[in-house]
Every structure is written in structure tokens, then in C-alpha cells.
Amino acid sequence: NVGKSTLMNVLIGEKLSIITNKAQTTRHRILGILNENDFQIVFSDTPGIIQPAYKLQESMMNFVQTAFQDADVLIYMVEIGEKGLKDEKLFEKIKNTDVPVLLLLNKIDLVEQEEVSIQIEYWKDKVPNAEILPISALNKFNIQEIIDRILELLPVCEPYYEKDAITDKPIRFFVEEKIREKILKHYKKEIPYSVQIEVEEFFEEETIIRIRAIIYVLRESQRGIIIGHKGQGIKRIGTEARRELERF
């Protein structure tokens, strides 16, 4: 959990990407749109880079490849102390790209300044074409510096989206993601990665929005675990997701 989705939410000022302490929380490519009077930045939050082991992960990595093709600036985020490379082929693309690369060294609030300096030198050697920016997404340290540097690197063009847009995803997508976030939060092992959420009904009335969502699982045994004793599990998911959706 390097902090990509946390950064995206901080940059946009809205919680678009769900956040948990589990790996591979992000399944889809999510666009976050930052609008000001004289600029529009479209951020693309992609799944983390991994070696795909099954079809869903292959699809997730396709989102990453698409982002490579579309980007005017590549932002590669690493966690302080991280040294392993998740995908050598993709990493070579980063090192050889013609697009400007910002390498964000996240979670610097967890170590001393001396260690930050060591890490900066390490990544300068690993990715010589990248500009290194030490940040703390959680504590919002150096966030404005990221925006300022991106603006210096972006081409001048007409905005892609309306000025009041913050994402390209429909509201149903975020309903499904909020429910999935609560499952990731409360369940362990394979269950969080074995579910799919589908919003079946979405009715906007004058004072309330009525939503009916289905949670699909791979095996019958997982159904009982999700529901919980006397329905307490599914009730907790519904209550927490509902509260967050009301704020959203």
C-alpha cells in the first residue's frame, strides 16, 4: 500500500478512490479531475503494478498500460524504504519513456531526514530520468509542490471535461466501490478479493436516494461469512457504506 489512492483523494479534495490497508485495493482506473480558473489536471489512479496471476489482475494491468499511452506526465510513487521492482518490463518503460516522470517518495514522515536523503540518492540512480519529490500524502506534505510541477510540465490545450466535473465515473460506480471498501475493511484472506458488487436499482427521490445492491461471491460458504451471525455482518457493511455515501 504505497499511498496512490490517498494522494489522488488529497489532490482532488474528494474521496474518489477507496482506501484500505490491503494490497490491490484499486481494481479500476479512476480519473480524478482538478479544476481551477486557468487549468484542468486529469489524474488517473491505476491499480498497483504487479505480475498478474489471474484474469482480473491481467485486466487491472491493462488499465496501467492504457494510462502509459494517455499520460502527459507519469507519476511513479514508491514508499520510503521500498527497493523491489514489481515489474521489470514496466519499469524499463518508465526509465525509457519520452514523457516527464515524477517519482514521489511517500511516507517520509515515518523516517529521519538522513534516511530520506539516502532514499532520494537511491532512486536517482535507479530512475535517472525522474525528478524525485519527497512527500507525505497522509499529512499533505509537498502536495502543492506536486501540482505546481505538473502544471509546468503539462501542454497547453483545451479542457477535456466540464469545469464542474471531478471524475469520469458514474455515481453507481462509487456506490459499488464504497460497499467493496467495507468488505475489504472487515473481512480477511480471500473473501475481499472474491466479491463483486452490482448496483441493481438506484432511485433518486426528492429527499432520499434508494439503492439496491447485490454482493456476488465465488462460493456458497463465503455467503454465510459475509452475512454473519444473525445478519450482523451484512448489516455492518450496509450501515457504514450508507454513512459514507451520505457524506459523499
Task: Go through the PLM ranges and name each one.
Residues 35-40, 59-132, 203-208:
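Conserved C-terminal guanine-recognition region of P-loop GTPase G domains, centered on the G4
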Residues 1-69, 73, 214-216:
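Conserved G1/Walker A P-loop phosphate-binding module
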